[in-house]
Amino acid sequence: SAWYVPGGKSTTGRLYQDAGAAYVWAEDEHSGSIPLSFETVFDRGQDADFWLFKYNRQQDKTLTELKSDYASYAGFRAFQTGQVYGCNSGQVPFYTETPFHPERLVLEDLIRIFHPGVLPAGECRYFKRLEK
């Protein structure tokens, strides 16, 4: 199955860069999602400090569930350090709110994740760190 990662020129790719992240696909010229194999993503992203993804479920996903989905996920540094963040679109209004103000709504979450302590105290609106 394919992994879909945001291209470097996509809205999400640019938001990562605006939030001060060293996005591993920043140099990619695509303005949308890029379908890649797990092996390609792992080869390039295994040492990334953070792993963010979106999903839709009734309850939040955990690291244990993620590992049981595919054991190789545990090979990512972000998994090993607990820096995996999920946006459960079944629980938060990501797709209804962010198209109108991605720079304000999503960017704040990304800054909170990538640079804790920079913004005043508060919690992410869309992304949540996966629990064990």
Describe each model-derived feature in a short phrase.
Residues 8-11, 109-113:
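Detector for C-terminal structural segments
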Residues 48-49, 109, 119:
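Short, intrinsically disordered/low-complexity patches at protein termini
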Residues 114-132:
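Extracellular/periplasmic juxtamembrane helices and adjacent flexible linkers that interface
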Residues 1-101, 131:
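Binding-cleft/active-site segments that stabilize strongly anionic ligands or cofactors
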